[in-house]
Amino acid sequence: MDDETKKLKNKNKETKEGDDVVAAESSFSSVNLHIDPTLITMNDVRQLSTQQNAALNRDLFLTLKGKHPNLPDKDKDFRIAMMLYRLAVKSSSLQSDDDATGITYTREGVEVDLSDKLWTDVVFNSKGIGNRTNALRVWGRTNDALYLAFCRQNRNLSYGGRPLDAGIPAGYHYLCADFLTGAGLTDLECAVYIQAKEQLLKKRGADDVVVTNVRQLGKFNTR
């Protein structure tokens, strides 16, 4: 992991400017971790094909590079992971009332202004995904392994109020993302994730409701 401090500013009402984060290396190794498949049940299993996802991620990176021409190609995974991080903060739920507009971060001395509209427009207009219901979630689910690998190396990123509402402990706030498939979670991450769902329901007086789909969690976006 790089020792260089990364400056991150979330452009929304709740987030303080100047959050410092530590950036991960731009390459991510594959993650092969045990999970009990009976612990998390998902009804929403839509994902892109490998070819569709590669094409979309290439378009996302090229769009960002069009705004910042000096970005090295080797950083593509890192740049896509930052977009996935933004998706986790915003929530992919169609019920989300998030009003965030993007972030500004610095990597290797280069400041990048990552507008949410820049990457969401690319996803919505993609031929392989744009015509699907909630295209952002389909893209997020397809890339959740990249998201998890990135977040495990950057555990101090800010996700707003949702992780606190859910009682997610420090260092695991990335589990508030509502596009996770459940695959690749460690046993501890799985336990935290399930506990968070139960906590959100209890805080809203819905003890008799069972969450069987991460789509139900996105609406819990603010305190």
Swiss-Prot record:
It is found in: Virion. Signal peptide: none annotated. One of its GO terms (cellular component) is helical viral capsid. Belongs to the closteroviridae capsid protein family. The keyword Glycosyltransferase does not apply. Disulfide bonds: none annotated. The keyword DNA damage does not apply. Keywords: Capsid protein, Helical capsid protein, Virion. This is Capsid protein. Its main location: virion.
